[in-house]
């Protein structure tokens, strides 16, 4: 893939997603970052780090940075993307079971936003057990 002609989307701008998105931007890709939190998106748009990770503080792109787009709308971002990485949380419930609701919701939003006939690559980067992608996303295809 040629960075100059490839657009990467990152769904979830937390501890994993934000540094991942910044890494792709630094490598020359156009990047669309998406988070459902308006507060997170507003903070990133201001060029500030919403994660609390001090290693990321000086890395967040300044407002107006070329090739850097941040939104709360998966539907807005995904049609622009050649590759979409889903980096949403997978917390554990009170009974110590993985909560896959974020994975399912993000997958649904991505697949609904994909234009027909597209060859977009969609990657689940969240920490999950074997079979989760087939279990949560395959029925959506």
Spans of features found by a protein language model:
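Conserved N-terminal Rossmann-fold NAD(P) cofactor-binding segment
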Residues: 2-5, 30, 36-83, 89-97, ...
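Conserved N-terminal Rossmann-fold NAD(P)-binding element of oxidoreductases
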Residues: 9-12
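Gly/Ala-rich phosphate-binding loop of Rossmann-like dinucleotide-binding domains
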Residues: 21, 25-26
């Amino acid at each position: 893939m040629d960075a100059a002609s490839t657009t990467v989307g990152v769904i979830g701008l937390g501890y994993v997603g934000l540094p991942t998105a910044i890494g792709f931007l630094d490598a020359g890709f156009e990047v669309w970052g998406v988070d459902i939190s308006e507060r997170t998106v507003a903070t990133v748009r201001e060029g500030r780090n919403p994660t609390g990770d001090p290693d990321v503080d000086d890395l967040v792109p300044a407002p107006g940075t070329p090739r850097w787009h941040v939104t709360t709308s998966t539907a807005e971002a995904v049609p622009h993307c050649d590759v979409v990485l889903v980096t949403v949380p997978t917390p554990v419930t009170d009974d110590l079971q993985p909560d896959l609701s974020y994975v399912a919701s993000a997958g649904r939003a991505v697949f609904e936003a994909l234009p027909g006939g597209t060859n977009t690559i969609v990657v689940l980067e969240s920490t999950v057990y074997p079979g989760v992608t087939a279990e949560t996303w395959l029925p959506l295809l």
